[in-house]
Amino acid sequence: CARYASAKERGTMVSRVLYRPFDTEDFDAIALILQQLWHNNSDNDEYNRLEAACDLAYCLSSSTFSQVAVIDGQARGISLARAGQSSGATVKEHWMDTERALLSQMRELEPDACAEYLSFVRATIRTNNRLLESSPLPHDNEVTLLAVDPDVHGLGVGSVLLDAAVSYLSSRGATRAHLYTDSNCSWKFYELHGFKRTATHRANREERRHDMPRESFLYELDLTA
């Protein structure tokens, strides 16, 4: 889920940016950002909204850290990370239940689109597992999501959010952090922040049929440097 969307800077004027942990009241605003960036394949906007919300619920269920950028009272970006399995079981269950409920609504609204989305998710998980297996990195200490509203791109919000996630992993004793990204995302952003590409997967014809990106990457950051 760690992705950073490239978009043109639009000259947005802001008074100040507040950074704080995720609050459940941020959910709809963050899901809308994910919808704009990655969940807009269907002609049915309501389905796209549900799919983005499902993606966000999944990321929240698998993360132990959150940081949100708030501008003028509105959530405009988020970073999530996972270090171990220390998140409260109640919180994890809440987001897993939310994900299941959203999937049920997706199936009812657009069964074919939902089936294709689940095929994409399974293919992505398989690809990420292969990438990780090709490296000595542990499963934990991952930046699980980075998403910023395109309207505030260029203001440094993504950099602050990424630094917050990395600092959290370091504070939990991690010596290396990793994330997954792909050729559809701004992978150069991570290289500018010290991450190094350690593995690449090129999608085969079947994976491309499920809308997988041409190339998927594993990036690593040395936290001891």
Regions found by a protein language model. Give the residues of each.
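A short beta-loop-alpha structural element at the N-terminal edge
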Residues: 16-32, 83-84
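Active-site rim helix/loop that mediates acceptor-substrate recognition in acyltransferases
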Residues: 44-71, 76, 80, 101-104, ...
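Conserved acyl-donor/pantetheine-binding loop and adjacent beta-alpha core of acyl/acetyltransferases
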Residues: 85-141, 205-212
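Conserved GNAT acetyl-CoA-binding A-motif
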Residues: 140-141, 169-182
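A short, internal acetyl-CoA/4′-phosphopantetheine-binding micro-motif in the GNAT/acyltransferase core
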Residues: 146-153
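Conserved acetyl-CoA-binding loop-helix of GNAT-fold acetyltransferases
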Residues: 154-167, 192
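Conserved active-site alpha-helix within GNAT-family acetyltransferase domains
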Residues: 159, 183-200
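Conserved catalytic-core motifs of GNAT/GCN5-like acyltransferases
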Residues: 178-180, 196-213
